[in-house]
């Protein structure tokens, strides 16, 4: 095992123990999270209106808290976008993930707090790498670059210190500097809104790098990989990146794309890791 992989496993050892605890005690961990959400929800106007402070059990939560659609709580979200705090969550939300509006004509704005990014969106990739290195201790994936294909919605200013955009663009904008050393393309290229231009620049940048993993939605990544093949004139991805070994994917069913990926990445050592 490479020295860097040993260091990675050592660095993530505490987190791996936490993940093992989640597996062994799922009900306890979920109850703890339930209490955390209730305690913070009770500090908000939304939670006070629904009497969250008086909720003691999950059954009481189900009985008292109705199911809301976006339109029902849009007024609360609009107030959050204007900078009000303690409306839906105690922490101020300065970032808003902008959806494509699939269930209506207007885009939807999902508040994203810094704590939410740190405890979920930023922790998730670390957990993936920790689990992968644990499952495959002889991996060399950390010795190369990870190629990421983010969204194409431009980051827009919503007002004083408020920003909105595609969730992946928000995460790229807030990624720690050290992570950018291990990832391509550079932030400027990753945030280009025009998909064709972005893929062209990725093709130019990535073919000169030692890419060993990539991540994103299967459909768009397949388009990107085929563009890279066209750009280089190669038959398959291994001719460009011989050490490619991992695709971390999510967002849609991977099964319709499996055969196409195996065709352009004909390696028995290639791993596909789905996230949810």
Predicted regions located by residue number:
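Active-site phosphate/ATP/adenylate-binding loop shared across adenylate-forming ligases
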Residues: 1-29, 34-276
